[in-house]
Regions:
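Secretory/extracellular carbohydrate-interaction modules
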Residues: 57-60, 85, 91-174, 265
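Flexible glycan-contacting loops in extracellular carbohydrate-active proteins
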Residues: 223-257
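Short, aromatic/His-centered strand-loop micro-motif at the edge of beta-sheets
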Residues: 175-198
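Short, composition-biased motifs enriched in small/polar/acidic residues
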Residues: 266-341
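Extracellular carbohydrate-recognition regions
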Residues: 45-80
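Short tryptophan-centered beta-strand motifs in secreted/extracellular beta-sheet-rich domains
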Residues: 133-135, 195-205, 210-212
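Extracellular beta-strand elements of beta-rich domains used
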Residues: 54, 257-261
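Bacterial N-terminal signal peptides
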Residues: 28-39
Length: 341
């Protein structure tokens, strides 16, 4: 099955998106509070599966498309369909060169155009079940009324799509799709054009789960990598241009940098902890995102040196709230979380 068939075009109802935007505006406030919250991650040795900054020093030449690089060190990129792609300079200020997809129209009426670097990595065979993909990305809008979607899609080595994280160019919402045929589902999160975002996709191939954060905020938590029993290995992670009106694409584009995939011998996806609010009595309301059924210890500190365990929680459904009623006793209160062995 080719990539045109395994990608999905399903949309989201405007009524549902409007409701979710109310949540999104509240979560922007949370970002300022959560900046004090330290996430916990084990210092286990990592293996770099693939990493590039698209720099000239790596062999990337701005005079060629991304999939047509002349250097033997950079010519491994592959594409499906046709469309604009290549190398830009300083679109992220001070970051050197970046890759991009979009802007120039396809030579035919294809709906999907994707570029990727073949990985063909087998996490379980290599005893590295934890795989993290991170990328700095930005979407610049069309100057016309034709707005398209851009997404990141993860495939196995057989070319079967596991899941996608989609950035809707019309509604400015972030949505996701699994391999269950149900189409795109809302994450409740929005994005802005012409703004940089750090996207992190974390996968646990041992437990068949994936999560996503955008600028450190969780947008997808503990969803199945595959619902169809597909082979659990990592074939590639694609940048995808989804053209809404075949034959009439927008001149929008997505550029990206610091494209990196690392693998760890972890047993679970590291948790994400947020401070949701502070109650009138001074208590802090925390929200922890983790893997379903696992226990996590929430720790607190007033100086970032000495840490005290304040609560062990169980993420029964992957998300759990905790109210720290002792927070009012401290002028400063920092939090972190770790999986309880």
């Amino acid at each position: 099955m080719d990539r045109a068939h395994v990608e999905t075009c399903a949309g989201i109802s405007s009524r549902f998106v409007t409701m979710k935007y109310a949540i999104l505006r509240w979560r922007y406030v949370v970002v300022l509070l959560a900046a004090l919250c330290l996430g916990y991650r084990s210092t286990i040795a990592q293996t770099t599966v693939f990493s590039t900054g698209f720099e000239l020093s790596e062999g990337y030449d701005q005079g060629f498309t991304l999939v047509g690089q002349p250097s033997t060190s950079t010519n491994g990129w592959v594409s499906f369909g046709s469309g604009g792609n290549g190398i830009l300079t300083n679109f992220f200020e001070g970051q050197g060169q970046q890759g991009f997809i979009g802007f120039n129209p396809p030579t035919d009426t294809n709906v999907f155009f994707s570029v990727w670097k073949p990985l063909n990595f087998v996490p379980l065979t290599n005893d590295l079940p934890g795989v993290t993909f991170s990328v700095l990305m930005q979407i610049d809008p069309s100057t016309s009324t034709n707005h398209d979607d851009f997404r990141w899609s993860v495939y196995n080595s057989e070319g079967k799509r596991f899941f996608s994280l989609d950035f809707d160019g019309v509604t400015k919402t972030v949505n996701y799709a699994l391999d269950d045929g149900l189409g795109l589902l809302s994450t409740g999160t929005g994005f802005e054009n012409s703004q940089p975002y750090e996207l992190v996709l974390t996968m646990n191939f041992k437990r068949n789960l994936w999560s996503a954060t955008l600028n450190g905020l969780p947008v997808v938590n503990a969803k199945p990598i595959t619902t169809a029993g597909s082979a659990l290995d990592l074939g590639d992670i694609d940048a995808v241009w989804v053209i809404r009106a075949p034959g009439a694409p927008g001149n929008n584009y997505m550029f990206f940098d610091n494209y990196r995939i690392v693998a760890d011998p972890i047993s679970s996806i590291p948790p994400t902890l947020q401070i949701i609010s502070r109650l009138p009595n001074g208590a802090s309301v925390l929200q922890l995102y983790g893997e379903p059924g696992l226990n996590y210890t929430i720790e607190a500190s007033s100086d970032l040196v000495s840490w005290t365990a304040v609560k062990v929680v169980t993420a029964t459904d992957g998300v759990v709230d905790y109210v720290d009623s002792t927070a009012a006793n401290f002028n400063l209160r920092f939090y972190r979380a770790r999986q309880t062995q």
